[in-house]
Amino acid sequence: MELGKSKFSWKDLQYCDKAGTQNSPLRVVAHIDQDAFYAQVESVRLGLDHSVPLAVQQWQGLIAVNYAARAANISRHETVTEAKKKCPELCTAHVKTWKAGESEAKYHENPNPNYYKTCLDPYRHESVKILNIIKKHAPVVKKASIDECFIELTSDVKRIVLEEYPYLKIPSEDSNVALPQAPVLLWPAEFGMVIEEEVVDRTKEDYERDWDDVFLFYAAKIVKEIRDDIYLQLKYTCSAGVSFNPMLSKLVSSRNKPNKQTILTKNAIQDYLVSLKITDIRMLGGKFGEEIINLLGTDSIKDVWNMSMDFLIDKLGQTNGPLVWNLCHGIDNTEITTQVQIKSMLSAKNFSQQKVKSEEDAINWFQVFASDLRSRFLELEGMRRPKTICLTVVSRFLRKSRSSQIPMNVDISTQFIVEATSKLLRQLQQEFDVYPISNLSISFQNIIEVDRNSRGIEGFLKKSNDEIYMSTSVSPSIEGRAKLLNENMRENNSFELSSEKDIKSPKRLKRGKGKGIFDMLQQTAVSKPTENSADETYTCEECEQKITLSERNEHEDYHIALSISRKERYNNLVPPSHDKPKQVKPKTYGRKTGSKHYAPLSDETNNKRAFLDAFLGNGGNLTPNWKKQTPKAISNSSDNMTQLHLDLANSTVTCSECSMEYNSTSEEDILLHSRFHSRVLGGVTVSFQCSPIYRVNYGLSSDCIYSINSESSLIDQRKAEEALSFVNNELSSEPIETIGVDKYTTFLFISDKKCVGLLLAERISSAYIVDELELNNNNSTSSAVYIKNENLRKGFVLGISRIWVSASRRKQGIASLLLDNALKKFIYGYVISPAEVAFSQPSESGKQFIISWHRSRNNGSSKSLRYAVYES
């Protein structure tokens, strides 16, 4: 480095507060971690000093231990009895709990898990308080968990540096010119322990501090202020790490616990990292880290430093090779953004001993779940609310769910949640024998941002110059459907609104002659701009009207409604081809599954249909009275119309590969078929936050297997259930909800970000033995699986509920690989034998796979024709 010059340029300084800050060479990031957070919350609540040994209790186990108790060799997951033997003066505080039938959580003494549910609200509330304090000092914060977060400090530090060194405010004309020499700063001890090179020749020129050290200095100062502020306001201590990226800052935040902070300088990165193991690095832990160690033959980062990038790519593949090389060299360009807003909430409880045996017992628990969801719902940031409430019931032989929509004008109170779920429970009771219940849950789904400027369908019904008026008794948020009359309706027809609620009927609409729904929509679409006239405008391609951007969505909805309304009106003009009304089978979209056709509709189709249903009502029938009075001229000339109807029917084709039935003359159908066809043959696109449990190879394909269960993140569970839903449609199977249910584990084979294989495993205890040799000796030619009660056996562990492979990847060993991984990974630390596996209602092809798989595990022995099945 040239004497008096920095190795950083003016461009590097300017880059600190622009998009892509994570790539700036002057980047600084902090990681803050609360010290024994749950224990601290209870100590503050009870007014105890931090020096008093304290552990947080849940039932008879410990879930958090403060540092004073750790000094007595007490650890988490010990029982209360064991812990008090080690430290008689140990103070234990049980977490807050809800009692069945109560709507308020309390600190109960010795609660029974059969009648109580844990409440973690106090810790969530304190976590929110801590984050709010941090955001006052630095706004870019990402919550990593309930007790830790990452802070992007680069732009905040740049602002301070420019204030401290005003000469940096006047940049050089050439941004590539080096910055002036950085000042020498004295680090006070309160800023934390600074990790530097162990052996430093301070006479060397390259030891001179540069601007990256200055940025670290002021970042450490901000973090110290944050930690002091948290303690001043809440009395909580926390530890912190400050360095150049999230991985390094998290790595050093635990170096100097509790209640201290650690700074890792750039010249010390190598010395610090080579002393660690690969699995110590963020994102390289768990099973993924173990796979890397096995492939590289070492667990030392020091050895990785001696490996080239090409060597790692050859060993680990194009994706994982560079990832491991960068992380082991201290490079992490992960962007820190605000946390992704949650889309769902779940409150659930397992009843392992005391089952729920009646509706009254279930409603008592609904009161608890409702209070839990209500309190968490109120904590949501912004104007957000769920669209759907869902009830899930699990019994010994049954898992069923029911859901209902939450009206936008309803207050989501505890009473509303209880009443809504009670209604759903009664629906399930009428259809199934749901008792005794072993798992019960209520969830909010489809949580969305509420647009304050949004309006309902009544917003389209503006007054016109034809004396259209509405009764003031109609609420702006009224539910129900509007039955509109078209231009062929009589003048004396009335306009009515209906609702399930007690709403007075509106007065009749006075209309001018010849005015129908299209006229009303047209008035809305081309209405004169008011206060938005000064806004930017765009020209509509459909009608060439200039529309303000603020009204664009409304205008596009108008065209959707108008086009579909015309189409529906035209369809109503086509008379039947026979005197007797013929029931025409509606066109369906999707793959043929049994006697039904199914595939998800496109977003555009769903939007059109939802809008039209809400707008038109009565099944989209625009002309109920007109159909009763069809003019003779139309009814008598039906030949051409009938021929047109037959032509449309003949254009329906069925794809030979994906079995989807669609209309070959409809652009919309062709697009739907294209999407569905690629999905069926190529697999479902999916990605997970967690690491895979198995990697087939580390080449370009990056084939791997993921395991998703109730302990996985909610996002991953949802993605796995979406893939399972697709598989259920493929196999014509009943839907199964796996989110939050302990007994299910989903194994997914992912290739190039597509799920091309899926296996759903569940815990079982018994199954029926099936002997194919006996069936063959009896000359049975049926594909059915026959079971006998006397063949029921216990001792089974793993049940295979679903197993599926995409058509394009069959006969490549994927199903066997999924099954083998299920044997190894379904129960942690235990490898299940083939004799402990049973299959749920296999088809003929499923039987052939089972027999083949058993034979391969028994070296081709004929005894392998014995297998087990169970009733799911």
Curated annotation (Swiss-Prot):
<feature type="zinc finger region" description="CCHH-type">
    <location>
        <begin position="653"/>
        <end position="677"/>
    </location>
</feature>
<dbReference type="GO" id="GO:0042276">
    <property type="term" value="P:error-prone translesion synthesis"/>
</dbReference>
<dbReference type="Pfam" id="PF21704">
    <property type="entry name" value="POLH-Rev1_HhH"/>
</dbReference>
<feature type="binding site">
    <location>
        <position position="559"/>
    </location>
    <ligand>
        <name>Zn(2+)</name>
    </ligand>
</feature>
<dbReference type="GO" id="GO:0035861">
    <property type="term" value="C:site of double-strand break"/>
</dbReference>
<dbReference type="GO" id="GO:0000785">
    <property type="term" value="C:chromatin"/>
</dbReference>
<dbReference type="InterPro" id="IPR043502">
    <property type="entry name" value="DNA/RNA_pol_sf"/>
</dbReference>
<keyword id="KW-0131">Cell cycle</keyword>
<feature type="region of interest" description="Disordered">
    <location>
        <begin position="569"/>
        <end position="602"/>
    </location>
</feature>
<keyword id="KW-0012">Acyltransferase</keyword>
<dbReference type="GO" id="GO:0005657">
    <property type="term" value="C:replication fork"/>
</dbReference>
<dbReference type="InterPro" id="IPR028009">
    <property type="entry name" value="ESCO_Acetyltransf_dom"/>
</dbReference>
<feature type="binding site">
    <location>
        <position position="543"/>
    </location>
    <ligand>
        <name>Zn(2+)</name>
    </ligand>
</feature>
<dbReference type="GO" id="GO:0008270">
    <property type="term" value="F:zinc ion binding"/>
</dbReference>
<dbReference type="InterPro" id="IPR001126">
    <property type="entry name" value="UmuC"/>
</dbReference>
<comment type="function">
    <text>Probable acetyltransferase required for the establishment of sister chromatid cohesion and couple the processes of cohesion and DNA replication to ensure that only sister chromatids become paired together. In contrast to the structural cohesins, the deposition and establishment factors are required only during S phase. The relevance of acetyltransferase function remains unclear.</text>
</comment>
<keyword id="KW-0863">Zinc-finger</keyword>
<dbReference type="InterPro" id="IPR052230">
    <property type="entry name" value="DNA_polymerase_eta"/>
</dbReference>
<feature type="compositionally biased region" description="Basic residues">
    <location>
        <begin position="583"/>
        <end position="595"/>
    </location>
</feature>
<dbReference type="InterPro" id="IPR041298">
    <property type="entry name" value="UBZ3"/>
</dbReference>
<dbReference type="InterPro" id="IPR043128">
    <property type="entry name" value="Rev_trsase/Diguanyl_cyclase"/>
</dbReference>
<feature type="zinc finger region" description="UBZ3-type">
    <location>
        <begin position="533"/>
        <end position="567"/>
    </location>
</feature>
<keyword id="KW-0862">Zinc</keyword>
<feature type="binding site">
    <location>
        <position position="540"/>
    </location>
    <ligand>
        <name>Zn(2+)</name>
    </ligand>
</feature>
<keyword id="KW-0539">Nucleus</keyword>
<dbReference type="GO" id="GO:0003887">
    <property type="term" value="F:DNA-directed DNA polymerase activity"/>
</dbReference>
<feature type="binding site">
    <location>
        <position position="555"/>
    </location>
    <ligand>
        <name>Zn(2+)</name>
    </ligand>
</feature>
<keyword id="KW-0234">DNA repair</keyword>
<dbReference type="GO" id="GO:0019985">
    <property type="term" value="P:translesion synthesis"/>
</dbReference>
<keyword id="KW-0808">Transferase</keyword>
<feature type="region of interest" description="Acetyltransferase">
    <location>
        <begin position="592"/>
        <end position="872"/>
    </location>
</feature>
<feature type="domain" description="UmuC">
    <location>
        <begin position="29"/>
        <end position="285"/>
    </location>
</feature>
<dbReference type="GO" id="GO:0009314">
    <property type="term" value="P:response to radiation"/>
</dbReference>
<dbReference type="Pfam" id="PF13878">
    <property type="entry name" value="zf-C2H2_3"/>
</dbReference>
<dbReference type="Pfam" id="PF13880">
    <property type="entry name" value="Acetyltransf_13"/>
</dbReference>
<dbReference type="InterPro" id="IPR036775">
    <property type="entry name" value="DNA_pol_Y-fam_lit_finger_sf"/>
</dbReference>
<keyword id="KW-0227">DNA damage</keyword>
<dbReference type="InterPro" id="IPR028005">
    <property type="entry name" value="AcTrfase_ESCO_Znf_dom"/>
</dbReference>
<dbReference type="GO" id="GO:0003684">
    <property type="term" value="F:damaged DNA binding"/>
</dbReference>
<dbReference type="Pfam" id="PF18439">
    <property type="entry name" value="zf_UBZ"/>
</dbReference>
<protein>
    <recommendedName>
        <fullName>N-acetyltransferase eso1</fullName>
        <ecNumber>2.3.1.-</ecNumber>
    </recommendedName>
</protein>
<dbReference type="GO" id="GO:0005634">
    <property type="term" value="C:nucleus"/>
</dbReference>
